[in-house]
UniProtKB/Swiss-Prot annotation:
Transmembrane segments: 13-33, 53-73, 80-100, 102-122, 137-157, 164-184, 303-323, 341-361, 370-390, 396-416, 431-451, 460-480
Biological role stated in the UniProt entry: Extracellular pH-and Na(+)-sensitive low-affinity creatine transporter. Also functions as a pH-independent carnitine efflux transporter.
Protein name from the UniProt record: Monocarboxylate transporter 9
Classification lineage: Eukaryota, Metazoa, Chordata, Craniata, Vertebrata
Subcellular location: Cell membrane
MF terms in GO: carnitine transmembrane transporter activity; creatine transmembrane transporter activity; monocarboxylic acid transmembrane transporter activity
Entry keyword annotation includes Transmembrane: yes
Length: 508
């Protein structure tokens, strides 16, 4: 059952506004968790690697659970999922204020808040796409900046709340603010279906029998059977209440014996239903095999395989600065009075700018989005390697701005995926890539923290991060170079291109 045509405006702009504030409220604290990270280090006295798991889980769980989030939104709709997820995020933040140890935060802040954010992201993107068609890119760009603006504001807000109310009070207030997501969700009016104004149950006779395993003649015979044909008689009586415990003997005459036999039509129906279940299970298994086959075919595309490696390495190396920059400044002995603007705030506002500008740049026909994405990866890797050389607030602020701007390449990642696999395989491929992006988000900060615990300095940690991102960028660059297209041209050409890779590599 399809939805009516996207209005490309009207109530859709209300959807854009509430989706913007939904992402602002849910992602503000998890993305600005670097401010809380420093406080948790002092409060619980755990290592940097272990403490970093809290923030990395909050960002990674939502991406790891993206298939489940999509299933919930498609089953229940954006409005119920948004309201439910608002309770999850608010409850997780408030529960974190009661955390007795770091392991409690793994659950309350990392898993509960992270899962709520993943559900909210899927819900806001889904309903925005339903309301917009020709202006979909603009609408998605506007709502995606909500998380970046939230990072910018929440970094300063959480620091101020900690000064006035302490860490526990800060988490309680931020959790209370997250309850405004419920109001945003209530305004997410779903589009009516194209064939009926309200959802109605379809009459059974109107449903096509796709899994029929017996012919119409047999069904008609079963439907026209009388009550007596099935082995029952009008003379049969129910036992009175007083006769329940009394033993009865079976009738010895042939007519009575017929009643004790299981009727043949009933046996036939049991066999038919058993076969039906077997056939349905076989179809489900075939769907699963087809899914695995499609996944395997995606990885036969060299560009997609390189993109998979690049996004994994990018998130392992590129995500830690958004979580750890505040502690990096403290470890480099930058004075508190010099931190006029939190480094996390600079990172956040430049991420919003990067999303908008890179998204606009990707719309130009003369720009190859694959090469643009590779350029952001390589420059990000170089900026990460430069962090150990920055020992002052000014240089750290400049690098935070550069890294934030380049992290805005998330806005062009769907373009890159589409160009790699085609629009027909976008949903499947994007889900796989987001899963591994979540894996990288979850692993990156703890790895950097472990390097610090091992060496007592962030220098080697950020050299490692920069190397990961550079490696991913160069692997993707080698996969899309035109020379691969020329190598393919020397081989015997089939009647039609069998992979999308040839098209991508030759499109310079």
């Amino acid at each position: 059952m399809g939805f009516q045509k996207s209005p490309d405006g009207g109530w859709g702009w209300v959807i854009v506004v509430v989706s913007f504030f939904t992402q602002f409220l849910c992602y503000g604290s998890p993305l600005a968790v670097g401010v809380l990270y420093v406080e948790w280090l002092d409060a619980f006295g755990e290592g940097k690697g272990k403490t970093a798991w809290v923030g990395s889980l909050a960002s990674g769980v939502g991406l790891l659970a993206s298939p489940v989030c999509s299933l919930f939104v498609s089953s229940f709709g954006a409005r119920p999922v948004t309201i439910f997820s608002g309770f999850l995020v608010a409850g997780g933040l408030m529960l974190s204020s009661l955390a007795p140890n770091i392991y409690f935060l793994f659950f309350s802040y990392g898993i509960v808040v992270g899962l709520g954010c993943g559900l909210l992201y899927t819900a806001t993107v889904t309903i925005t796409c339903q309301y917009f068609d020709s202006r979909r890119g603009l609408a998605l760009g506007l709502i995606s900046t909500g998380s970046s603006v939230g990072l910018f504001i929440y970094a300063a807000l959480q620091r101020m709340l900690i000064e006035f109310y302490g860490l526990d009070g800060c988490l309680l207030i931020v959790g209370a603010l997250a309850l405004n997501i419920l109001a945003c969700g209530s305004l997410m009016r779903p589009l009516q279906t194209s064939d009926c104004p309200f959802p109605e149950k379809i009459a059974p006779e109107n449903v096509p029998d796709r899994y029929s395993i017996y012919n119409e003649k047999e069904k008609n015979q079963e439907e026209t059977m009388t009550f007596q044909d099935k082995g029952y008689s009008n003379e049969d009586k129910c036992l009175p209440n007083g006769d329940w415990g009394r033993e009865t003997s079976l009738p010895k005459n042939p007519t009575g014996a017929a009643h004790t036999k299981e009727p043949e039509p009933y046996k036939k129906k049991v066999v038919e239903q058993t076969n039906f279940c077997k056939q349905l299970a076989k179809r489900k298994w075939q769907v699963y095999r087809n899914y695995c086959g499609e996944t395997a075919s995606l990885f036969k595309n060299k560009v997609f395989s390189a993109l998979f490696v690049a996004i994994l390495l990018f998130d392992i190396g590129g995500f830690p600065p958004s979580l750890l920059m505040e502690d990096v400044a403290r470890s480099y002995h930058v004075r508190e009075e010099d931190l006029t603007i939190p480094l996390i705030s600079i990172f956040g506002i430049m991420t919003a700018v990067g999303k908008l500008l890179l998204g606009i740049l990707a719309d130009f026909k003369w720009v190859n989005t694959l090469y643009l994405y590779v350029a952001t990866l390589i420059i990000t890797g170089l900026a990460l390697c430069a962090i150990p050389l920055a020992k002052s607030y000014v240089t750290l602020a400049i690098l935070s701005g550069i890294l934030g701007f380049l992290t805005g390449n998330w806005s062009i990642f769907p373009y890159v995926t589409t160009k790699t696999v085609g629009i027909d395989k976008l949903a499947h491929a994007y889900g796989i890539l987001m899963f591994f992006a979540g894996l990288g988000n979850s692993l990156g900060p703890p790895i950097v923290g472990w390097f610090y615990d091992w060496t007592q300095t962030y220098d080697i940690a950020f050299y490692f991060s920069g190397f990961c991102v550079l490696l991913g960028g160069f692997i993707l660059l080698l996969a899309i170079l035109p020379c691969w297209g020329m190598c393919n041209q020397r081989l015997p050409k089939p009647a039609a291109p069998t992979t999308f890779f040839y098209k991508v590599a030759s499109n310079v």
